[in-house]
């Protein structure tokens, strides 16, 4: 998605060989025009899949998930990292390691919200090693529901999250696939492939 790549180039900040900061437009401050385009792109890719719920983890996945769900006309659920007092123990739960925060969280979703007949689209801001993705898959499986696919805003293709998911048979749609953060700059997969073919 060209507008997303442009935002990454112009407003993203490479902090290391594995970390990209996008808090000026995606996961702290949100660019409403861009997030709407992101939502439209995922909705278009998954429009014929009979999606009944969109699922993400709080908090960075909330903005894109809400917009995707709006375009698909279905509810969205965010797995909570901290169980509020208002949530009973009637929950699905999974352990998820955060690459960025270097910590493990127990994520929960109320059993009242996810059911065996649901067809679930999982949305997240980043895909690196697939920890969050598999944690959300586990919750969907506990409900007896079906994961239809993954919508990833930014994929770090140099890490193995995509391979792990596709090896398990999951569909993965990423709007920006990053090959590397070499020398503090972002190189996208399609640009890398173009360079190799020259």
From Swiss-Prot:
Chief localisation class: cytoplasm
The enzyme's main class, written as a single word, is transferase
Question: Does the keyword section mention Transferase?
Answer: yes
Segments forming a coiled coil: none
Q: Which residues bind 5-phospho-alpha-D-ribose 1-diphosphate?
A: 128-132
Q: Which UniProt keywords apply?
A: Cytoplasm, Glycosyltransferase, Purine salvage, Transferase
Q: Which GO terms describe its cellular component?
A: cytoplasm
Q: Which reaction does it catalyse?
A: XMP + diphosphate = xanthine + 5-phospho-alpha-D-ribose 1-diphosphate
Residues reported to bind xanthine: 20, 27, 156
* Single GO term (MF): xanthine phosphoribosyltransferase activity
Report the protein's function. Answer: Converts the preformed base xanthine, a product of nucleic acid breakdown, to xanthosine 5'-monophosphate (XMP), so it can be reused for RNA or DNA synthesis.
Q: Under which name does UniProt file this protein?
A: Xanthine phosphoribosyltransferase
């Amino acid at each position: 998605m060209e507008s997303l790549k442009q935002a990454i180039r112009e407003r993203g900040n490479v902090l290391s060989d594995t970390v990209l900061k996008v808090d000026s437009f995606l996961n702290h401050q949100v660019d409403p025009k861009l997030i709407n385009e992101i939502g439209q792109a995922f909705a278009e890719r998954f429009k014929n899949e009979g999606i009944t719920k969109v699922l993400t983890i709080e908090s960075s996945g909330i903005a894109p998930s809400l917009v995707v769900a709006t375009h698909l006309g279905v509810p969205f659920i965010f797995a909570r990292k901290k169980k509020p007092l208002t949530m009973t123990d009637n929950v699905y739960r999974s352990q998820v390691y955060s690459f960025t925060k270097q910590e493990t969280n127990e994520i929960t979703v109320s059993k009242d919200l996810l059911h065996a007949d649901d067809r679930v689209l999982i949305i997240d801001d980043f895909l690196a090693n697939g920890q969050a993705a598999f944690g959300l898959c586990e919750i969907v499986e506990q409900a007896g529901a079906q994961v239809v696919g993954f919508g990833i805003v930014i994929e770090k293709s140099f890490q193995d999250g995509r391979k792990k998911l596709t090896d398990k048979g999951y569909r993965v749609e990423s709007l920006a696939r990053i090959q590397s953060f070499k020398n503090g700059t972002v190189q996208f997969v399609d640009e890398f492939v173009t360079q190799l073919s020259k």
